[in-house]
């Protein structure tokens, strides 16, 4: 028997905080960096944690953001511990506006009152989505979790929605609507159905969104 039992609550891997506002923006893959820069600038976000799938992708995104005048730094497995700590400190003190990270490198990150997390690329593991956005909306503060989804990532979104047992809201931003004729490049192994099937589905979704979706700047 326990003399002084205590109840410890652990957040399950299939739930997200109510304080986090989630949104998915469909966009062509090659326009993701452009949309990311637009969102950071137009929404005036001063502290944004951005997740990519690969180390190389995180470094390339830093270069793209700098071209748009947004100070950014990356933390990934190729960086030394000293370099990671410097990047994190610059992010916390406001010298760097966007911190680009991989899932592995971001483990253990603790940033108080982080205002926004962006999934530049959706994770292969749905549980990683929960871990990513769990870094905002802490201690009663509100936060935003934005996902930039290209057509070839729809299956990843479905996996996330299945895990969370909910549909995530989607919104098309005017000027960044996906092109239904864009070439499809999947990150997963090829399946039996062809690209024409995917394009037909995409065109059908375009018609649906045209009728009911919201277009905003």
Model-based region annotation:
Residues 1-181:
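Conserved helicase RecA-like core
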Residues 93, 167-217:
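Basic Arg/Gly/Lys-rich low-complexity intrinsically disordered segments
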